[in-house]
């Protein structure tokens, strides 16, 4: 009787141990490399696709002759400083098995071409995605919302061509910008683009919470920032895949890093950590789940002796353990879109 009782106790303990093993926290699971793995979507376990995007702003005179921003990429020292900042952040990301989606525009591209700087070509050769960041007023002027789809398309094509010249990449699919132009998706499709994200109202510096989440969709149309119906309505035949940024709970999540709301770089990355964990909770098995955030050249530099340490710390303490456990997987924006397209079939 005693022996039977012991055996039963052992069986119960083993059963509990097995059940607990299913929910071992990601940070406690054994580390394993996941660098350069193909994007997968195992129906048995939700996976969150992750990357860091980079917006290169239009600082100086653009290819269309519009003066924009503070600073000027036509000044060699200013341009080189930003080149070094971009390289520093991309190298940090590479060291953790990731690749970024680099979003460029003139005059950064034109200066790179004119000066013979190969930074975009070098980054493309190392696996980073080349894409377009389109500040419409810097390329179309102040009345951009009144212009035709063809005018938008022509200028977007011009900017894409400059990215191709600077990087050697011909397959440019992703763009950010043009957010308040109702016909932006028609213009983007005309320009050969099919992946979009980073929607923020440039006037309010906010993102409607209707746009947040982890699952991509195909918007049936654009928005003026007031009427959100077409944007939030999924069209199975829509030409563009929209990638939400994650399960954020603040409408100013995209701009708070440059405001007093976050308090500090460290506080902002603590907010990112909580948002990433919330996105993991929202992720669904068998669906494409995404989370990403954006940086700019020189942003979050912090201590000159340890530049961009807050980014490195976030990757070491938050992202790396989740990649090792299989909960998170690195993927550039077009790879996220392709993973979503694969689930549509």
Task: Give each language-model segment a name.
Residues 1-45, 188, 342-345:
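Intrinsically disordered, low-complexity Ser/Thr/Pro-rich tracts
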Residues 171-289:
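Active-site-adjacent pocket scaffolds in enzyme catalytic domains
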Residues 196-203, 207-211, 263-345:
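C-terminal domain-boundary segment and adjacent tail
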Residues 59-64, 139-142, 250-254, 302:
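Short acidic/His/Gly/Ser-rich catalytic and metal-binding motifs that mark active-site loops
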Residues 76-89, 113-117, 149-159, 265-278, ...:
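Well-ordered, non-membrane alpha-helical segments in soluble/globular domains
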Residues 45-54, 122-133, 239-245:
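Short coil-to-beta-strand
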Residues 39-122, 289-293, 297-300, 306, ...:
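Active-site beta->alpha N-cap acidic-glycine motif
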Residues 96-182, 246-249, 290-299, 332-335, ...:
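Metal-dependent polysaccharide deacetylase catalytic core of the NodB/CE4 family, i.e.
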């Amino acid at each position: 009787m005693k022996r039977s009782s012991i055996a039963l106790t052992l069986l119960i303990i083993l059963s509990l141990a097995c059940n607990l093993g299913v929910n071992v926290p990601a940070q406690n699971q054994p580390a394993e490399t996941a660098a350069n793995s193909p994007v997968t979507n195992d129906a048995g376990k939700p996976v969150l696709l992750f990357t860091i995007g980079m917006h290169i702003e239009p600082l100086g005179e653009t290819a269309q002759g519009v003066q924009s921003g503070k600073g000027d990429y036509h000044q060699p020292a200013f341009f080189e400083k930003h080149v070094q900042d971009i390289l520093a952040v991309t190298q940090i990301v590479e060291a953790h098995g990731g690749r970024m989606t680099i979003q460029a525009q003139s005059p950064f591209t034109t200066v790179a071409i004119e000066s013979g700087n190969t930074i975009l070509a070098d980054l493309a050769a190392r696996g980073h995605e080349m894409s377009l960041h389109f500040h419409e007023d810097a390329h179309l002027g102040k009345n951009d919302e009144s212009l035709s789809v063809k005018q938008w398309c022509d200028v977007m094509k011009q900017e894409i061509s400059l990215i191709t010249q600077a990087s050697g990449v011909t397959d440019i699919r992703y763009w950010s910008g043009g957010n308040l132009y109702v016909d932006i998706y028609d213009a983007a499709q005309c320009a050969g683009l099919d992946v979009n994200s980073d929607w923020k109202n440039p006037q309010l510096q906010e993102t409607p919470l209707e746009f947040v989440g982890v699952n991509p969709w195909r918007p049936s149309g654009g928005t003026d920032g007031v009427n959100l119906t077409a944007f939030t309505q999924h069209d199975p035949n829509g030409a563009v895949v929209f990638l939400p940024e994650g399960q954020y709970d603040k409408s100013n999540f995209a701009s708070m890093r440059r405001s007093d709301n976050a308090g500090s770089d460290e506080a902002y990355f603590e907010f990112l950590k909580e948002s990433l964990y919330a996105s993991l909770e929202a992720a669904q098995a068998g669906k494409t789940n995404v989370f990403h955030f954006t940086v700019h050249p020189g942003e979050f530099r912090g201590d000159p002796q340890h530049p961009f340490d807050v980014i490195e710390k976030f990757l070491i303490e938050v992202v790396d353990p989740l990649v090792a456990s299989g909960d998170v997987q690195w993927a550039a924006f077009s790879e996220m879109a392709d993973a979503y397209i694969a689930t549509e079939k």
